[in-house]
Amino acid sequence: MSLQSIKYSRGSLEILDQLLLPGQSKYVVVRGVEDGWKVINKMQVRGAPAIAIVGCLSLAVEINPEDFENKKSLRQEIEGKLNYLVSARPTAVNMKIAADELITLANELYKDEATDVTQMKHRFLDATEAMLKKDIADNRAIGANGAQAILQRVAKAGKTPAGSTGSVRVLTHCNTGSLATAGYGTALGVVRQLAELGKLEHVYCTETRPYNQGARLTAYELVHEKFPATLVLDSMVAALLRAKNVAAVVVGADRVASNGDTANKIGTYQIAVVAKHHDVPFYVAAPLTSIDLAIPGGDHIIIEERPDREMTHVGEHRIAAPGINCWNPAFDVTPASLITGIITERGVFKPAELKEAITKLLES
């Protein structure tokens, strides 16, 4: 059974505080938008899909008990609060896309004379709750599509470990499982699907400095699921790919540009370079909501920079020399030329065909 990072019922929202993992499992009550903004910004909840869901649900629990005088005041409340939530962590596109969809819905309901203010509020609440259910379904589809793509490619290349009956070894980076989504996961969902098919020989996860999402969160999930897993340092990836017959790398994404350039957790780019050198296929697993067709390439993606303290301290203990300067981008951009395929809930696409394929899917 996968971990539950988000507990929601109408009017009530709690999130598993990921800053305390793996030492302590504690849920934090989110009472409204201010709480939602803080837990996203402080990374008590993280992962692009989870950020969007928690952000939208924080608004849902805030407006649920309120009585609005008219539809105009409700529409203004929705638009203003959603735009504010987008600012909590701007690199992840999912929150912006979700906000735009809900603002569009609010505007449509506002203009619909047959809908009164109470109906408008309940329609909005229904839409936010539907996002939670859809994310889990999308994750499962991503997992199935990704596992199939990896197994087909590996079988064709003959890269399964000797004596493994078709099972594979994979590497993942950061945390992209149940803790980063509404449930199941994106890249880790692919790993989970491989395990369900009996085709997972081994999974390697990076520590993912400086926030250690791999060591704290992914390792926690892998142990919970009892998957055959090994933690490696970020600096070990080249040695790992050379020595351990890894069949594929699969990572998540915070934003994918229309040309396939992908912003993901810092360190992803160098893993892609190493994978290319060792002829290991490199996959990005992401829902359609992580793909931003409005951005032509990775150079246009805003990269969030985090506080120095995340690099210089572990807990309250300083590990870096006082006075040293730090550069701490939270993400890097992997060029499309290094990406084998982008795994979505609607299929696996080569970066060069991504824009046309997604445009057709959205039109249909």
Swiss-Prot record:
Enzyme Commission code: 5.3.1.23
Residues the record annotates as the site (Transition state stabilizer) are C174
Question: Pathway listed for it?
Answer: Amino-acid biosynthesis; L-methionine biosynthesis via salvage pathway; L-methionine from S-methyl-5-thio-alpha-D-ribose 1-phosphate: step 1/6
Q: Does the keyword Metal-binding apply?
A: no
First-level EC class:
isomerase
Provide the alphabetized UniProt keywords: Amino-acid biosynthesis, Cytoplasm, Isomerase, Methionine biosynthesis, Nucleus
Annotated catalysed reactions? 5-(methylsulfanyl)-alpha-D-ribose 1-phosphate = 5-(methylsulfanyl)-D-ribulose 1-phosphate
- Where does this protein reside within or beyond the cell? Cytoplasm; Nucleus
List the catalytic residues: D254 (proton donor)
MF GO annotations: S-methyl-5-thioribose-1-phosphate isomerase activity
What Pfam family does this protein match (any one)? IF-2B
A GO-annotated cellular component: nucleus
In terms of superkingdom, the source organism counts as Eukaryota
Q: Which HAMAP family match?
A: Salvage_MtnA
Its biological purpose is as follows:
Catalyzes the interconversion of methylthioribose-1-phosphate (MTR-1-P) into methylthioribulose-1-phosphate (MTRu-1-P).
Q: What protein family does this chain belong to?
A: Belongs to the eIF-2B alpha/beta/delta subunits family. MtnA subfamily.
User: Mind telling me what this protein is named?
Assistant: Methylthioribose-1-phosphate isomerase
Q: Which organism is it from?
A: Drosophila simulans (Fruit fly)
